[in-house]
């Protein structure tokens, strides 16, 4: 596995439309061409199978969007935690929100228990408060996400990002093209992490051994890579494989 991490770092710093991002992809194109030439020489054309993909896409820089009269903006997660804690202090006498990360709010179980409060009541109150803020499109209890009213594709993607004991108690979806960043007129960067298509739109390319030229319009995901390789090799997929083979 070869990780090409410079595109991620530069994309975060300068945005999807930045000239710096353009430059790094032009250089990457040359590097990939050299890499394929070396494989052809050392391994032999048709004797290797190569996949090219990514783990996420990205939103456009919100200042770029504003310049083109399109919606977008910064989500101030620090202020969100502060406002939520202030509200919960009025309601329960405690500030149990430890922080926000990856569009999830994390709660201090020990603080809630020590105060003699019921955690579910605290979470429900927090959700009711957050839902009043128009910057949130959906706010939900991760333990009850199946009961939440939101489109299936968003619900599925948010559920896929949940892991017990590691994820937060409350998840949320901001308005499209709004992401956690500083709010400044000179901000050039961007981020990702929401279930919208621009965050999940990635390359999915395969090249080499037993791969004919072609394309498909069907939806594919990173999870399909392992399933596809197993299908090509005619072997059983590993226990953790949840994708579908993309075979033509």
Where are these regions (language model features)?
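Active-site His/acidic residue clusters
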Residues: 1-28, 34, 66
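Substrate-binding rim/cap in mid-to-C-terminal beta-strand-loop elements of soluble/periplasmic
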Residues: 79-116, 190-233, 247-248
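Short, surface-exposed loop/helix-turn segments at secondary-structure junctions
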Residues: 182-191
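Solvent-exposed, polar/charged alpha-helical surfaces in well-ordered, non-transmembrane soluble domains
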Residues: 26, 30-37, 124, 128, ...
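Extracytoplasmic/secreted cell-surface and envelope-processing proteins
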Residues: 10-13, 59-63, 114-115, 181-183, ...
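Soluble non-cytosolic domains of exported or imported proteins
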Residues: 19-26, 116-121, 216-223, 240
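Secreted, luminal/periplasmic, and some membrane-associated catalytic domains
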Residues: 19, 30-178
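Short connector loops/turns at beta-strand edges and beta->alpha or beta->beta junctions
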Residues: 5-10, 177, 201, 207-210
């Amino acid at each position: 596995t070869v990780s090409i991490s410079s595109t991620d770092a530069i994309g975060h710093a300068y945005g999807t439309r930045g000239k710096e991002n353009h430059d790094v992809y032009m250089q990457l194109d040359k590097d990939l061409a050299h890499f394929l030439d070396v494989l052809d020489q050392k391994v032999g054309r048709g004797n290797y199978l190569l996949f090219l993909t990514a783990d996420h896409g990205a939103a456009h820089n919100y200042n770029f969007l504003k310049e083109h009269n399109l919606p977008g903006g910064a989500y101030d997660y620090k202020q969100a935690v502060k406002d939520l804690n202030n509200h919960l202090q009025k309601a329960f006498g405690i500030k149990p929100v430890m922080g926000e990360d990856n569009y999830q709010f994390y709660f201090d179980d020990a603080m809630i228990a020590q105060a003699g409060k019921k955690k579910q009541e605290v979470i429900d109150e927090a959700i009711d408060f957050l839902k009043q803020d128009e910057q949130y499109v959906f706010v939900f209890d991760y333990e009850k996400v199946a009961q939440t009213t939101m489109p299936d594709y968003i619900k599925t993607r948010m559920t896929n990002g949940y892991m017990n004991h590691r994820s937060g108690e409350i998840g949320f979806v901001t308005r499209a093209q709004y992401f956690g960043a500083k709010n400044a007129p000179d901000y050039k960067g961007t981020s990702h992490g929401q279930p919208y298509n621009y965050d999940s739109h990635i390359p999915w390319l395969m090249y080499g051994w037993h791969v004919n030229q072609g394309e498909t319009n069907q939806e594919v995901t990173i999870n399909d890579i392992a399933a596809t390789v197993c299908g090509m090799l005619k072997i059983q997929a590993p226990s953790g494989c949840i994708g579908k083979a993309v075979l033509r």
